[in-house]
């Protein structure tokens, strides 16, 4: 299992565009990818679940990746967040 935290920098937070791209990225991997904010957890492969967390600028999220390709998945998701959110 790989886990990391990220503090959202984008002033709009995780809105529709980055949420959609995150879901698309998570679906590339066979590993289970979850996103957590303030104790609420969701499957990162489900757009409405990700949007439902209402992630805003300055909030910290935790990403957990578990499965065969967890290392590469965690690295790519972390890179995406750093570049886009």
Locate the predicted segments by residue.
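Intrinsic-disorder/low-complexity, polar/charged segments enriched in Ser/Thr/Lys/Arg/Asp/Glu/Gln
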Residues: 1-5, 60-62
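Compact, glycine-rich, soluble single-domain proteins
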Residues: 7-44, 48, 52-57
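Compositionally biased, low-structure terminal segments
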Residues: 5-7, 81
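C-terminal structural segments of small proteins and small subunits
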Residues: 51-85
């Amino acid at each position: 299992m790989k886990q990391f935290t990220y503090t959202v920098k984008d002033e709009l937070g995780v809105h529709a565009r980055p949420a959609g791209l995150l879901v698309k990225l998570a679906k590339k991997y066979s590993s289970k990818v979850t996103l957590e904010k303030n104790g609420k957890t969701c499957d990162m492969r489900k757009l409405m679940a990700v949007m439902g967390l209402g992630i805003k600028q300055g909030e910290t999220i935790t990403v957990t990746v578990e499965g065969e390709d967890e290392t590469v998945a965690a690295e790519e998701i972390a890179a995406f967040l750093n570049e886009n959110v």
